[in-house]
Swiss-Prot record:
One of its GO terms (molecular function) is 4 iron, 4 sulfur cluster binding. [4Fe-4S] cluster binds at C151, C154. The keyword Iron-sulfur applies. This is Fe/S biogenesis protein NfuA. Homodimer. Keywords: 4Fe-4S, Iron, Iron-sulfur, Metal-binding. InterPro entries: Fe/S_biogenesis_protein_NfuA, FSCA_dom_sf, HesB-like_dom_sf, NIF_FeS_clus_asmbl_NifU_C. Involved in iron-sulfur cluster biogenesis. Binds a 4Fe-4S cluster, can transfer this cluster to apoproteins, and thereby intervenes in the maturation of Fe/S proteins. Could also act as a scaffold/chaperone for damaged Fe/S proteins. SUPFAM superfamilies: Fe-S cluster assembly (FSCA) domain-like, HesB-like domain. Pfam families: NifU. HAMAP family: Fe_S_biogen_NfuA. The gene is nfuA. One of its GO terms (biological process) is iron-sulfur cluster assembly.
Length: 199
């Protein structure tokens, strides 16, 4: 179920009236759903823009159309038009399921490791243009990772592995006993910090 506040409905209605297009509504979709990059997208939608499989939510003076593939990701979403402490007004969308949900404790260790890597570790590494991919998780709980981007060949990869990634995975996932690097760092062509510079 999606909640859209009266203030948000008034805001949309005024914008739609200004456009003056009969039957115009607002279309809501999830972009990159289930990933750390997930976001909600709102756009005007004329009747000809609709595919016909959208979920229609009748609002005061217009219809909110939710793209069918986005419905599960938008469950529990709240759309509001709020006044910030600075006095500015802003449209807000809170969609708690849009980035996906962490796997249950009963999920495999591989699924849980991948979730933490994609949702906690890689967003931090992205600030340096880096990333890691899970290559393997052994039955004993040893995680084998492969660095990429700015982390591939980086002189600080060992520190990142031990003080950042291993600490995070072992702290979040009981059962992970070690994290190892499977990357051939000599082949990195654009490291964040070249290996010969890190001392």
């Amino acid at each position: 179920m999606i909640q859209i506040s009266d203030k948000a409905q008034t805001y949309f209605r005024k914008l739609i009236e200004r456009e003056g297009v009969p039957g115009m509504g607002v279309r809501l979709s999830a972009v990159d759903a289930g990933t750390p990059r997930a976001d909600a997208k709102l756009e005007f939608a004329e009747p000809a823009d609709l595919s016909g499989d959208e979920w229609a939510i009748d609002c005061d003076g217009f219809t909110l159309y939710v793209v069918a593939a986005s419905v599960p990701w938008m469950d529990g979403a709240e759309i509001d038009y709020v006044t910030q402490s600075t006095g500015n007004q802003q449209l807000t969308i809170k969609a708690p399921k849009i980035k996906g949900e962490a796997p249950a404790e009963s999920a495999s260790m591989v699924e849980r490791v991948r979730w933490v890597v994609e949702n906690e570790i890689n967003p931090q590494l992205a600030s340096h243009g880096g990333r890691v991919a899970v290559q393997e998780v052994s039955a004993e709980g040893v995680v084998l990772l492969r660095f990429g981007g700015g982390c591939h060949g980086c002189g600080m990869a060992d520190v990142t592995l031990k003080q950042g990634i291993e600490k995070t995975l072992m702290g979040r996932l009981p059962g992970v006993i070690a994290v190892r690097d499977a990357t051939d760092h000599a082949t990195g062509d654009a490291p964040y910090i070249p290996r010969d510079s890190a001392a």
